[in-house]
Amino acid sequence: MKKITALLLVLVMTLSLAACNGTTNTPETTTEPTVAGPASALEVLETIWALYTDDNKFFAMGGDYETPVDGAPGAVNLAVKDFLTYSLLIPEAELAGVTEAASLMHAMNANSFTCGVYKVADVAAFAGTMETAVMGNQWMCGFPETLVIASFGGGYVLVAFGVNDAMNPFLTNLQTAYPAAELLVNKPIA
């Protein structure tokens, strides 16, 4: 009789736990998701460039003066300071804060399209400095029409400027490749 009572008790407890669905009333804890960001500055440009169809690709080059890459983005050697300041318009005072860089440029006219992606410690300060530098630049041999600055997780900042025919497809590919990227600046260059 004791065995039957014990079995009935186990059966009743099992059914009651099943009815409660085994849930407990513990408070939910939520954490903000972290944005990991890209693995490298070069990865950002390679991912965006890969979205171009052959019909949309322009005659491009990447890298820097010493290590150019034909027809694709390339990593920038940070020791080539004149390329960083002259071609990518990074103010010399900001160079120490850049720990990684990659570039993609129109091979015939850099003012038609130039893009750099940089790893920096202070994204907001660097973006503000770059906006001021590009907007205040004295242009020769063609004038870029649009400036775009975007940030990614991990301290990566993209700065691109050029004519609208080059910038519009680039911006579309940027937003397709990195929908979580924060567009900090998207404005005409006056």
Where do the model's predicted regions map?
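Soluble, non-membrane globular domain cores that form compact, hydrophobic packing
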Residues: N21-T114, V120-A190
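Bacterial N-terminal signal peptides that target proteins for export
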Residues: M1-L8
